[in-house]
Each structure stands twice: as C-alpha cells, then as structure tokens.
Amino acid sequence: MNKVILMGRLTRDPEVRYSQGENSTAIARYTLAVDRRFRRNNDGEQTADFIGCVAFGRSAEFAEKYFRQGLKVIVTGRIQTGSYTNKEGQKVYTTDVVVEDQEFAES
C-alpha cells in the first residue's frame, strides 16, 4: 500500500502548466511546509519538511483557482519517485506526492 496524508501550508502559489496534445491536461505543482511533531532543539524552534506535490486534471485546476501561498491544506495521495539527468549530466532523483484528494484545512 502506498498512501500519504499531509497537512501543511503552501510555500508559494502553485505552478500550473498544460500537457501537449489533443486532450491537454492541467498539471499543478506546489510545495507544502509540513511541521514536524517534535521541536528541533531546546530553544523551541519548529522544524518543517518541504514536500513536493503534483496534481492532475480537475485537481490541478482547483489548485490553480483556489490555492495561494500560506494557505493551510490537507492532501491525500501516494508517493512517487523518479529521476532525470540535469544539464550538467548528473542524475537527479525526485520524490513527489501525487495528489488524489486535496482540501482546505481552515476556513
């Protein structure tokens, strides 16, 4: 089973593009800052993980229309890994959450 549930704040507005072809599909990418449960050190400083999310189709269009930097959201999805070769010829590994459901966490 591959399932993840996250609650966090958008670090910036989603980046949206559309796939090429006859049936173009919206693709939205955004990053969530998800607070860790524990404090980093004795000064009480909160730490967060920054997790990349990608939404497709209607979910992407929803994110484009309603999601903005700083908004607190809940995302349900699955983890997907991948890789690509960058301009310097180095292999780069990626980990993203493919969004299955997303909703507002506060009104």
What positions do the PLM features span?
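Single-stranded nucleic acid-binding surfaces, predominantly the OB-fold ssDNA-binding core
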Residues: M1-S107
